[in-house]
């Protein structure tokens, strides 16, 4: 089955869900085409909100094999993110408060984050389903090419999961498997991106691999269901502002978690009106963009995009604004066409 409807909240388990934003049926954001007319499948791209914990999630989940078995995103190719991974390795080791011996990185991609941990003397283990990346990630680390499920077994001091946790259609099962593989005094570090998406009226990071958008309350309730405790939350500017959730099996939640939830409450994150306004603001933003594009087209200008990113495809397919071309410096994308909107991708040499 390629499509599954998410009928209950993936965080707290309740079935009280309210539609927030409908981005129409769209193809997978990274499914670039060799020709304009190449057949492609489209799937619903809508987000719902849980009325109990305000967790935001996709209305439907696409079969992960269609997305991850051949994954084009490679984490170690941008200097900004490589520098961040250096900081992250130091941060994780310092928060452990002792001398960690081993780390498991779930969704380890090309192994770049594991490289940083190995340089600090840790035994390194990884899990990732991308067959095309396994040769890279397994060069210096013990990496299982597949999904992190109940069959995986490797006891470690630290478990990290950067951004991939929100890709998981069964997060409770995921955390239970973490608990099974974690040493008694171990820690879990889960990073989720776009923590301010709703408050900032952002929708371009909504695509089929991003199933969940966690707030602090929804993550706390999910941890509690798994018999774990959320013990701290740190905000970091990477990926449009991310949360790093620090989770323990043997430490109780400190008072500051309630204070952090109170801050989200004060910002309006648990207010129904916030989500009504968010939906309308996103629609209004697109309409204003379309008006500007139409104005410049009428003046004889071409409409050219820069960067054939997944988030650009969400925007293109929702707005239906016709672009003449998109410039991208990645030679692997040049000569291809964007999914859905079928815009040709070219190199920056066309500017000459």
Which residue stretches match the model-derived regions?
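Conserved class I S-adenosyl-L-methionine
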Residues: 99-109
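Flexible, glycine-/basic-rich loop-and-beta segments that form/coincide
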Residues: 240-285
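A conserved beta-strand element that flanks and buttresses the S-adenosyl-L-methionine
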Residues: 160
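N-terminal juxtadomain amphipathic helix
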Residues: 2-80, 234
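Short, glycine-/aromatic-enriched active-site segment of Class I SAM-dependent methyltransferases
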Residues: 190-212, 216-218, 223
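Conserved SAM-binding loop of SAM-dependent methyltransferases across substrates and taxa
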Residues: 110-120
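Conserved SAM-binding strand-loop segment of SAM-dependent methyltransferases
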Residues: 139-150
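A short glycine-rich, Lys/Arg-flanked "PGG" loop and its adjoining helix->strand segment in the class I
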Residues: 172-187
